[in-house]
């Protein structure tokens, strides 16, 4: 290691100690090696002052001699230049100045070289020396960085203060420009409004996505004599008392009869037909007449028409209608029921092949699995009450039936001229579910809607045109007197016959029937009123037929029932329908009130509403139904309608019902 000599006067001339993030000590170093006797300990270095002074004196003398020699050389060079340049006085002053600058630079470089001869390179670090005095150098570096950071912070603070002053002055200028206004609401921009999108329920409220509907006016009627029907058909219609065709019959017959006549010459497929018409509008007659007219001249018996209905009563009703219309032909019309075993019924179908089969979907699927029925010659497929059949799976009947038809009616050279299956879909509340309708595999579908297109609310939920609807509002506190209110209202309105009352369950129908019978027995002493009920507990075919027969012949004046008979029950004598319990949907409401006002006859529907909750729900249901007349509100004064004596009799009737339950 070298000894070190520090000159305080030279510190001002030396370069900076901190350069580009590195600490570069600027130290003058001696060229003499430190002897062993100079070292006192690890951290202290002893300098030989006498020898240093002698060497310094020698160096100064040498420097002075060199300077004198340089001055003499410069003087000689100047004299020679003056002699040589005496003839060329035209040189410019700029050249002389440049030469003098060059000479000055050479002089400075020589002086710097002399200074460097006395010292070691300033940027070279002595690692051994700096390692011993590391703590001192670290403190020095820390102090240098702090000073630099302080300068940066102070400069940034000054800039922020200047910016704040400028922004403050600008705000003051803006405040001076703002106009003063009165104490009034400030004008606000118009709020953006969201675009109202059509909901999925609105989209599925109709069948416009399937085909363009064709509307048939309710008042559009036409005599059967104007249709091109066979003579036997005119006679059968006259014997049944049908003179004029209703709107749905006019629309269907006008389309299908010309197509049936055209298919006798060419096997053109005219497409399937979907019909939406209110209950009691004559849908059964609308599809029975074209089928019988098409099959009247058949030679070999084959299953050419299948009619699917949801319940057994509808099976009997449809078969009875078709048998009456087919009088004078050889058509074999059969119905499939659960009265006999499936094997015995299968043997009968194989022995005596029918022309028309009327069945429920579940029973038909069982026979298809046993190959009791062949669909190779099937010409017509009718789905009555289609919304109920499609909403209930019934052993996945639609997929099985359609797949069987495609399997047995293969399009090839042998049957290229044969007619394909034509589907007729009928319902009072036709479903709009695309997934359910797609299972029937429609071909060129056509939609007929019996309603006035200008007065539609929901084209698929409509009530009979001759129906009058009423709503009876009561407080929720009076719900405990509900059976008594119904009995007294029927007595006051003189509606003690041909009345159908709907309840929500089997238990409530039995309880209400018993309670009404007890009330009428105590109040109506002069006139005998018979009350009956119909639900799943007495749904056997024989018992059900007897009840309906008694109700039609007025042996039963008031019939209490559930929604079991709300579909397809064709009793034209019903004049009034009472919704004792409100419905769960507008679809069921349409089928309930459709039990009256059938075949263009007048009818009434009364709805008992207790409390604001039921009133709100009834409005929701009613808003989805298309009707010709508005629902009328009926105000009932309970103080005048029900006396104290009536309440006592009602309590006695409740006690008698309780005694029957205990027994």
Swiss-Prot record:
Domain named Helicase ATP-binding: residues: 264-448
Short sequence motif DEAD box: positions: 384-387
Entry's localization field: Nucleus, Nucleolus
GO MF annotation, one: ATP binding
Sequence ranges of Acidic residues compositional bias: 39-79, 88-101
Biased composition (Basic and acidic residues): 102-111, 168-177
Taxonomic superkingdom: Eukaryota
SUPFAM superfamilies, sorted: P-loop containing nucleoside triphosphate hydrolases
Cited InterPro entries: DEAD/DEAH_box_helicase_dom, DEAD_box_RNA_helicase, Helicase_ATP-bd, Helicase_C-like, P-loop_NTPase, RNA-helicase_DEAD-box_CS, RNA_helicase_DEAD_Q_motif
Residues involved in ATP binding: 277-284
Main location: nucleus
Intervals of motif Q motif: 222-250
Gene Ontology biological process terms in this record: maturation of 5.8S rRNA from tricistronic rRNA transcript (SSU-rRNA, 5.8S rRNA, LSU-rRNA); maturation of LSU-rRNA from tricistronic rRNA transcript (SSU-rRNA, 5.8S rRNA, LSU-rRNA)
Keyword annotations from UniProtKB, A to Z: ATP-binding, Helicase, Hydrolase, Nucleotide-binding, Nucleus, Ribosome biogenesis, RNA-binding, rRNA processing
Region called Disordered, residue ranges: 1-119, 153-200
Residue span, Helicase C-terminal domain: 485-642
Catalytic activity line of the entry: ATP + H2O = ADP + phosphate + H(+)
EC number annotated for this UniProt entry: 3.6.4.13
Cellular component, GO annotation: cytosol; nucleolus; preribosome, large subunit precursor
Family listed: Belongs to the DEAD box helicase family. DDX51/DBP6 subfamily.
Assembly behavior: Associated with pre-ribosomal particles.
Domain notes: The Q motif is unique to and characteristic of the DEAD box family of RNA helicases and controls ATP binding and hydrolysis.
Protein known as: ATP-dependent RNA helicase DBP6
Higher taxonomy: Eukaryota, Fungi, Dikarya, Ascomycota, Saccharomycotina
């Amino acid at each position: 290691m070298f000894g070190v000599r520090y000159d305080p006067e030279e510190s001002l001339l030396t370069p900076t100690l901190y350069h580009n993030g590195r600490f570069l000590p600027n130290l003058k170093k001696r060229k003499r090696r430190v002897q062993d006797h100079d070292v006192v300990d690890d951290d202290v270095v002893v300098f030989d002052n006498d020898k240093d002074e002698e060497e310094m004196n020698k160096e100064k003398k040498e420097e002075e001699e060199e300077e004198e020699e340089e001055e003499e050389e410069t003087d000689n060079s100047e004299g020679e230049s003056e002699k040589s340049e005496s003839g060329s006085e035209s040189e410019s002053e700029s050249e002389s100045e440049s030469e003098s600058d060059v000479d000055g630079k050479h002089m400075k470089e020589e002086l710097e070289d002399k200074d460097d001869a006395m010292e070691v390179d300033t940027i070279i670090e002595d690692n051994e020396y700096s390692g011993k005095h590391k703590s001192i150098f670290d403190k020095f570096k820390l102090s240098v960085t702090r000073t630099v950071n302080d300068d940066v912070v102070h400069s940034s603070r000054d800039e922020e203060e200047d910016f704040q002053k400028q922004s403050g002055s600008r705000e003051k200028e803006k405040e001076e420009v703002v106009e003063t206004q009165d104490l009034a609401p400030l004008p606000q921009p118009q709020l953006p409004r969201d675009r109202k999108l059509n909901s999925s329920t609105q989209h599925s409220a109709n069948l416009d996505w399937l085909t363009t509907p064709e509307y048939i006016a309710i008042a559009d009627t036409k005599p059967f004599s104007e249709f091109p029907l066979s003579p036997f058909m005119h006679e059968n219609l006259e014997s049944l008392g049908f003179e004029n065709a209703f709107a749905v019959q006019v629309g269907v017959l006008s389309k299908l009869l010309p197509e049936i006549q055209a298919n006798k010459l060419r096997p053109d497929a005219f497409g399937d037909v979907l019909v939406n018409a209110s209950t009691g509008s004559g849908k059964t007659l609308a599809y029975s007449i074209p089928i019988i007219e098409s099959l009247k001249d058949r030679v070999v018996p084959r299953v050419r028409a299948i009619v699917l209905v949801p319940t057994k009563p509808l099976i009997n009703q449809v078969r009875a209608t078709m048998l009456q219309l087919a009088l004078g032909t050889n058509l074999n019309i059969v119905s499939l029921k659960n009265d006999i075993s499936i094997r015995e019924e299968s043997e009968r179908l194989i022995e005596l092949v029918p022309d028309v089969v009327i069945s429920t979907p579940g029973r038909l699927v069982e026979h298809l699995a046993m190959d009791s029925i062949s669909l190779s010659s099937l010409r017509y497929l009718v789905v009555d009450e289609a919304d109920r059949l499609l909403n209930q799976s019934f052993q996945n009947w639609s997929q099985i039936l359609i797949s069987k038809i495609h399997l047995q009616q293969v399009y090839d050279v042998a049957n290229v001229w044969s007619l394909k299956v034509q589907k007729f879909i009928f319902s009072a509340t036709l479903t709009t579910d695309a997934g359910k309708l797609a299972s029937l595999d429609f071909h060129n579908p056509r939609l007929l809607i019996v309603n006035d297109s200008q007065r539609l609310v929901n084209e698929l939920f409509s009530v009979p045109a001759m129906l009058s609807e009423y709503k009876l509002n009561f407080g929720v506190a009076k719900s405990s007197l509900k059976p008594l209110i119904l009995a007294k209202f029927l007595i006051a309105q003189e509606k003690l016959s041909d009345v159908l009352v709907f309840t929500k369950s089997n238990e409530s129908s039995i309880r209400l029937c018993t309670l009404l019978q007890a009330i009428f027995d105590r109040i109506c002493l002069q006139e005998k009123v018979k009350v009956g009920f119909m639900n799943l507990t007495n749904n056997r075919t024989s018992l059900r037929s007897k009840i309906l027969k008694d109700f039609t012949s007025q042996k039963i004046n008031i019939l209490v029932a559930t929604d079991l008979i709300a579909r397809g029950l064709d009793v034209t004598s019903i004049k009034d329908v009472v919704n004792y319990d409100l419905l769960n949907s507008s679809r069921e409401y349409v089928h309930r009130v459709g039990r009256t006002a059938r075949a263009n006859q007048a009818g009434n529907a009364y709805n008992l509403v207790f409390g604001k909750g039921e009133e709100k729900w009834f409005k929701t249901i009613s808003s989805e139904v298309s009707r010709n007349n508005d629902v009328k509100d009926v105000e009932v004064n309970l103080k005048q309608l029900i006396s104290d004596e009536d309440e006592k009799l009602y309590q006695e009737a409740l006690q008698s019902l309780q005694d029957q339950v205990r027994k």
